[in-house]
């Protein structure tokens, strides 16, 4: 029992240090460079067969330290059903993005869509998922709140993690409840090993 507790604390500390390291690394890149890298990466996603085929997609409305998705979401919301996650308590709920004019500032100062909760999870064909870091096995390091670890098991969707190249690592600490991605992409291309579903 004591060993399990020590291992859990060690894992928590490793993840905390890794998040700090990635934040420091991000400071070495200008906003213009990150914007350009976001565009390059999202162009690859647009050309991905899973994206082309999908009609309903789980996306995210980016924070300043994430691959920038605002223009991408706006571009595609009229031809595909784009769902955005909303923080509600300690979970994420989903809402349909219908345009900039239907957004409001919610938890953590994040803009989020207004409207009803989307619950038809079987309709979602693709998830485009952010992360602090990803590794070659598709493991994801989030912000530490477990939001996506709770949401993703409810969905039966193919998930693509997206991040900047400096966030793509050989290996990150992962626990059994951490949800891995089917694919991981950076501005330089696919990062993780090929293991198609």
Question: What does each model-identified segment do?
Answer:
Residues 2, 6-122:
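N-terminal active-site beta-alpha-beta segment that forms phosphate/nucleotide-binding
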Residues 3, 11-13, 27-28, 113, ...:
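Surface-exposed, charge/polar-rich loops and edge strands
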Residues 44, 140-141:
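Short linear sequence motifs
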Residues 57, 127-128:
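Receiver (REC) domain switch-region micro-motif
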Residues 61, 131, 188:
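Glycine-rich, N-terminal phosphate-binding loop of Rossmann-like dinucleotide-binding domains
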Residues 64, 89, 133-134, 167:
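Short, solvent-exposed loop/turn segments at secondary-structure junctions
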Residues 103-107, 130-140:
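Short secondary-structure transition/capping segments
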